[in-house]
Structure formats: C-alpha cells, structure tokens
C-alpha cells in the first residue's frame, strides 16, 4: 500500500491548530443546534434580523441578480460536490497520494451523511414565504448547501494553504473560495428556503468538519512511502 510522505514539524503544528479551531467551531455549532432544537428566543431574533437584512427589498422575479443567485446556488449541491470530490480523490490516487485522496473523498461523503442524520434529528420545517422562488424539500436545519459549500470549498482552501503554491496564488484562490462559501450561504436565505440559523449551523458544521478531518489526516494518516 502506498502512503503519503512523512509529516513535517510545520504540519504537526498545523494539525494541532486545525484541531483546536475545529473543536471551537463544533462547540459553536452545538450552541446553534441547541438553540434551534429548543426554539430559543435569540435564534428567532437572529433569524428575523438577517431575513429583514437580506430579503428587504424582496427579490424581484426575472431580475439579473435573482438569475445569478439561481445559477450560483447550483454549485453547492451535493449532487455536484460529491462526484467532484470523488474525481479529486482519484486524481490524488493517481499521484501516488492515496491517503490524501481517500481522506478528501470520505471527508465530503461522511459530511453529507451527517447532514442527513441531523436534518432528521432536528426535523425543523422550512420557512413559510409569500412566494416560492425555488423548490426545496426536506427539513430545514442545517442548510445542506451551506454545509456542502463550507466543507467542500473550505477543504480545498485548507489544502491550498498547505500546498507548495506561491503565497500570492494561495491568497487569491483562498479569498475566492471563501467568498463563494459566503455567497452560497447568502443565497439560501435570499431565496427564502432557509432560516439564517440554518445557514449558520451548516456553515459552522462544514468548517468544523473540514478543520478536524484535515487535522486527522495531517496528524495520523500521513506516513513515509512504503510498500506492504
């Protein structure tokens, strides 16, 4: 079996940092999911504030911005991110970095399974709007689009940070990916298919998952090349 190269001191430190950041985000997610599950007033106030901020004035049917939002939200669907994650994982495998490829694909896949389980557990109905802008089915919390974008694009951004690319390239691509994550989260509230707390929960869980899974890879899965 082929493993990845030896972990460096820098990567050991990165694994610890990512693990700590991931745990913090998991704790924040725990606060949000408990607030949603027990219908806390602060969650309702948060939802009302951001719904008014994002959807006032209301979306205009046929507008260029609404068309762009419809288009962009497609890039956070699991039916797109999961197959691409598989292709990326296979590409890493062809590069003799099997552990990295397996980690990337199963990190995304397990995140999707966790999402579906949490939706059934919380069973939060979707918001009722005055007009359906896009069809959405299933329960509302957490937002699948927010989680998928934070997990998939967040994992790509983290991998980029620890690559050999120049700092300028890293910064440009990382900023683009982070902007894309926030845009995907904004879209779901703008279209009226999620509460802001759904999006916040999906974002926090996606970032927590990507940080902790990369920490696991850097800390335990990377090994010197050897054959078995």
Residue ranges and their predicted role:
Residues 18-22, 99-107, 169-176, 201:
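Alpha-helical transmembrane segments of integral membrane proteins
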Residues 3-9, 128-228:
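Membrane-embedded catalytic cores of phosphoryl/pyrophosphoryl-handling enzymes
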Residues 48-51, 84-85, 89-167:
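Membrane-interface loops
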Residues 9-12, 62-70, 92, 96, ...:
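Membrane-helix interfacial "entry" motifs
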